[in-house]
């Protein structure tokens, strides 16, 4: 009897597999894509709320990057945008190894890093190019350059104002000199558009860098930017290693460029339509 008092009590045991199964069954079944995390403040945002706010965080004001399709939906009058030259396809002029595979692996609705066409803003017809950083980081190759050049020529012939939403990592290295040539080609077309007395508005979005910054992004009659957008040519580390100096924390941000006179205004996404409409009216553009 006394001996039984010192016998260790038997506790109930649960098999590991049973426990794991029980825990997994208790997890809520949340469909993927229902929530998005803000990169700046880490807030979790309901996807529908994010779309309704034009993909801007309600907590901190962070502007999410948009693909071309989202940008068109946010900016233009509903169902007014008509895309041009969608069937232009990239080739591999330098036989760069793995280039075709990289193009095929790019999972986006766009067929290239820019969408070009004509749309309406409060009834006013404008020619517009929307760069897509989700397609090979918005890099500029021959097709990107050709589509933008054709759009500028179309705007010149039809006396249309021009807008370009820039978002790019720069020239596409897989196309070498063919890619770099697009800078001069686009700039030449812009010069003719300007000589015709037509308006060109450049809207810089995050990120706008490299050869795009060195050419048409900074050639607008009016240059606007979304808040906190990364804008520059060479990377921060490259510059610091070259000049042997530490750069300011906000270097290559839209606010820094505004302070230095490289940007005319920083406009929040919710105000972009109204701002550009006002600019068009002030410049005598009508329906």
UniProtKB/Swiss-Prot annotation:
Keyword annotations: ATP-binding, Cytoplasm, Fatty acid biosynthesis, Fatty acid metabolism, Lipid biosynthesis, Lipid metabolism, Metal-binding, Nucleotide-binding, Transferase, Zinc, Zinc-finger
Protein function: Component of the acetyl coenzyme A carboxylase (ACC) complex. Biotin carboxylase (BC) catalyzes the carboxylation of biotin on its carrier protein (BCCP) and then the CO(2) group is transferred by the transcarboxylase to acetyl-CoA to form malonyl-CoA.
Ligand binding (Zn(2+)): 38, 41, 57, 60
Family matches, as HAMAP family: AcetylCoA_CT_beta
Subcellular location: Cytoplasm
Molecular function via GO: acetyl-CoA carboxylase activity; ATP binding; carboxyl- or carbamoyltransferase activity; zinc ion binding
Keyword Transferase: yes
NCBIfam families: accD (TIGR00515)
Name of the protein in its database record: Acetyl-coenzyme A carboxylase carboxyl transferase subunit beta
GO cellular component terms attached to this protein's record: acetyl-CoA carboxylase complex
